[in-house]
Amino acid sequence: MELVVKDVQNVLSVSEIIFARDFNEALIHQVVIAYSASTRQGTRAQKSRAEVSGSGRKPWRQKGTGRARAGSFRSPIWRSGGVTFAAKPQEHSQKVNKKMYRGALKSIFSELIRQKRLIVFENFSLDAPKTKLLVQKLKDINLKNVLIVTNKIDNNLFLASRNLYSVDVKDVHSIDPVSLIAFDHVVITVEAVKRIEEILS
């Protein structure tokens, strides 16, 4: 299988086992859900009626006052009382096997190629860490919402992209299924493609 290298008008031979897989929607869905769940902090916490401060005595006697009966100052229906079903810190991460994760990435890359959303460059870099240079570079190739994947993080690219909400820069070791799906296009260098082949083979 061959991919067109845009900036040098050349072709790059890649493995069909990795870049020509069928689209496995169920697998990708499972991996994306698991990845998204693992990014949750899970640190929310509220106090139940057993944990809020306050006396344990009965506010007033059961009968004879004309008021509604009450048994505790910490009742959830009282102001400053506890929360009925108090949220507690929770671990949300889900287990995904390496084979499944890699299979999902292969399927995503294959679909990006089929949809012509994966654009390969021999070299994609900037002379200085300037946002306007990156904006102009993307304008020249008619791209807006884009993920840029390089073999190693290019400091100029990284700094130039930080102020652009529709552009992200990652190296091959930090790509994830959600980022690959979220952007309209993925710009990737030849070195990065070769490294991804090594990782996923």
UniProtKB/Swiss-Prot annotation:
GO terms for molecular function: rRNA binding; structural constituent of ribosome. One of its GO terms (biological process) is translation. The keyword Cytoplasm does not apply. Residues 44-68 are annotated as: Disordered. It holds the Pfam family Ribosomal_L4. It comes from the Bacteria. InterPro entries: Ribosomal_uL4 (IPR002136), Ribosomal_uL4-like (IPR013005), Ribosomal_uL4_dom_sf (IPR023574). Keywords: Ribonucleoprotein, Ribosomal protein, RNA-binding, rRNA-binding. GO terms for cellular component: ribonucleoprotein complex; ribosome. One of the primary rRNA binding proteins, this protein initially binds near the 5'-end of the 23S rRNA. It is important during the early stages of 50S assembly. It makes multiple contacts with different domains of the 23S rRNA in the assembled 50S subunit and ribosome. Belongs to the universal ribosomal protein uL4 family. Part of the 50S ribosomal subunit. This is Large ribosomal subunit protein uL4.
